Amino acid sequence: MAKAKFERNKPHCNIGTIGHVDHGKTTLTAAITKVLAEQGGAEFTDYANIDKAPEERERGITISTAHVEYETANRHYAHVDCPGHADYVKNMITGAAQMDGAILVVNAADGPMPQTREHILLARQVGVPALVVYMNKVDQVDDEEILELVELEVRELLSSYDFPGDDIPIVKGSALAALEGRDDNIGKDSINALMAAVDAYIPQPPRPTDKPFLMPVEDVFSISGRGTVVTGRIETGIIKVGEEVEIIGLKDTQKTTVTGVEMFRKLLDQGEAGDNIGALIRGIKREEVERGQVLAKPGSVTPHTEFSAEVYVLSKDEGGRHTPFFANYRPQFYFRTTDVTGEVVLPEGTEMVMPGDNVTLAVKLIAPIAMDEGLRFAIREGGRTVGSGVVSKITK
C-alpha cells in the first residue's frame, strides 16, 4: 500500500507529553499514534521506537527527544516525548522543541509526584500556554473515590502554579489498554476524548506573520547615496516600505522609517517572518545602529536590564563549566545576535550552582535588551556556551 502523504492543509500545532517518570508518557504517545492511525491520521509508532529516542545536540546541549506526527479532524500535530527527566528540563528551557501546549500524564494510582510538580513549574516558567491532563492507569484503581481525590489534587496543583486548575480538561483512561486494543471505554475511547480535549482546549498558536514586526540586527552597512542598511532575518511579523519602526536595545530607543526592503538584491514592497532582508532606514547614521539591537513595530517591545530566568547549566560532558558558580557570577548573556555582560543573583538559600543543574536566577544586564517573557538566551564565557535560559519574568 502506498504511503499516504500528510496534507498540510490543516492548522499546525506543537505539543508534547510531560509528567513523572513511569507514569506512561511514552505509552500514551504510542497509543495516540495507534488510535489515530486506525482513522487514517497517523502512522503507528510503537513504544520501543519512541523510547529509544535519538540524541540531538541543540546549541551544544545533548537532548534525547522522540518526534511523532499525527492529525485529528481539525489539526496537524507535531508531538515530542522525552525518555528522561533531564531531557525534559533541557528541552523546555532551550526551546529545542517548542510547545504550544502539553499533555500532563498522571498515574491515577500514584497521583502527582515530584517531577509532576517540576514539569508544571517548568511549563509555567517557560510559557507553555495550556495543559490538558491524562489520568493514566485507571484500571489499577478500584475505588472511584480515589480517582476523584487524585483529580482534585491535580487541579489544586495546577492552580498553585497559576494554571486554571478548575477549567483544565482531565481525561481518565489507560494508555496501555488503548495500545493493546482492549477495554475500549478506558482504551481507545479515552484517547479520542483526550484528542478532542487537546483540539478544543489548546489554543491555536498565532502564526509568526500575525505577530508584530521584529527583526534582530545582524549587520549594518552604509550605501553611498542611499543611506544606512541593516540586515537580518525577520523573526515575526511583516514590514512594508514606508512603515515606522523603532530601533531598540543597547542605547536609547530611536524611531525611523523603512524606506526600502531588499532580498537577494531585489527590491520588495514588504518582507515577512523568515525572510533574510536588508532594510534601508531613513535619517540614521551607520554608527547609530549596531548588531544586537532590533528593529520592531513601535510600542510592541521594550528594552530591559533586569529579569528572572529559568536556566539550565551545561554539564562538564556537554562542554560546560567544570566547577560551580557562586553569587556575583558575571558571564555574558547572548540574546538573538549579541552578548551582554550581566550579573547573576542566586535564589535565597542557594550557595552555588553546579554544572548540570537547572535553577531560577535573577539577572542584571549592563545594557538594555529588547525582551519579552519567553525570550531564549545562551550564557557564555568567552564565546563558549555554558548555559541556556528563558526569561520568565521581567523586573525592570
UniProtKB/Swiss-Prot annotation:
Its EC number is 3.6.5.3. Residues 19-26 are annotated as: G1. The keyword GTP-binding applies. Residues 10-207 form the tr-type G domain. It comes from Novosphingobium aromaticivorans (strain ATCC 700278 / DSM 12444 / CCUG 56034 / CIP 105152 / NBRC 16084 / F199). The gene is tuf. Monomer. One of its GO terms (molecular function) is GTP binding. Keywords: Cytoplasm, Elongation factor, GTP-binding, Hydrolase, Magnesium, Metal-binding, Nucleotide-binding, Protein biosynthesis. The lineage of its organism: Bacteria, Pseudomonadati, Pseudomonadota, Alphaproteobacteria, Sphingomonadales. It comes from the Bacteria. This is Elongation factor Tu. Its main location: cytoplasm. Residues 60-64 are annotated as: G2. Residues 174-176 are annotated as: G5. GTP hydrolase that promotes the GTP-dependent binding of aminoacyl-tRNA to the A-site of ribosomes during protein biosynthesis. It holds the Pfam family GTP_EFTU_D2. GO terms for cellular component: cytosol. Residues 81-84 are annotated as: G3. Mg(2+) binds at residue 26. The keyword GTP-binding applies.
